[in-house]
């Protein structure tokens, strides 16, 4: 990160940060995409099992990665104030925090998840695949969270290309392990859909090993003196949790409501479950665009706010939101035209393809709502405003999605589509609430700047 002098320099810097994050996010979401697509080609029953498992896994995992992502605004403010010597200390505190959170998530997966899966009315074969998938996936919990901390460090330093290169390794690693374990290639035991969980875990262990080597060999990071081990500092841990808990809670509130809808789908047929999950999976892949804008906004805004250049932060906000709209125009057009082709990536049954394509039509409205709401979350994190957005997200997602969806399901014949309608409306409401909060925060900082002149 560096100070910019004009709009053109800001645009160039923003895009330099954004594009590597975008590629990183695509690579990140590709792990789930590869698991779902390869399992769908194996058979629909295993796909239904994996979809139920990810409905439980995603909320808890994203909650914890949301907590450790608080490292980005913390380091951003240090850099904006010229306190680079504080970076290494905060990095190690978040490493310790990630290890502790790994134990929490492991306990949830091993003890809580099977109980949920066995009490939601799933077919026995589907439940068996889901439980085995989660157990295998739990092997990769530690590298998943530790890599999230390393990635947050690199992003906050503006080294988003390095994050991108590391994450690009995930796709071939995950695909290779999945091929071996799902289909039982080259004499490896055939594990079916559950093998996708083990494939992802092994891929992340390899990725973590490579990332640690890069961390201590990269010239640009040597000035941080990361080789010096720093002891646990409970004050900094508490600060990280205080800032990160609302971030994780906001992400959890959004992802969990999608997952609850996925679990509600258990009352429908295996075909509907598989089609719903496939459409939702591709929607998540497309979410990489607004999510990347959000991450880039958190980096640039936190840097400018830390340096007390509030007008520059405001300029970046405009650039980010316009970038989100431009990309949305392309992704919406692509998905509308090729929704049938996209559906065929997940299976070859004509009924499955037709049903998935219908769900994908609803996902167009997801993308439109996310284009508005997601960047606002990143902007608010850049201002270190996380507590109120958490409550707003809770209200927007849980106060709207499930009640509206249940109402549509009861009063209309929309069936499974009712729950997509509820989710779309909740995203729109949440976006409006975030926009209101940003207006309040920006006025507060403008008043602060005027009072110090």
Swiss-Prot record:
UniProt key word Transmembrane: yes
Signal peptide span: none
Q: What does UniProt give as GO cellular component?
A: plasma membrane
Can you cite a GO biological process for this protein?
A: monoatomic ion transport
Q: How does it sit in the membrane?
A: Multi-pass membrane protein
A Pfam family it matches = MatE
Q: Which UniProt keywords apply?
A: Antiport, Cell membrane, Ion transport, Membrane, Transmembrane, Transmembrane helix, Transport
Q: Which family does it belong to?
A: Belongs to the multi antimicrobial extrusion (MATE) (TC 2.A.66.1) family.
Q: What is this protein called?
A: Probable multidrug resistance protein NorM
Organism, by scientific name, is Streptococcus pneumoniae (strain ATCC BAA-255 / R6)
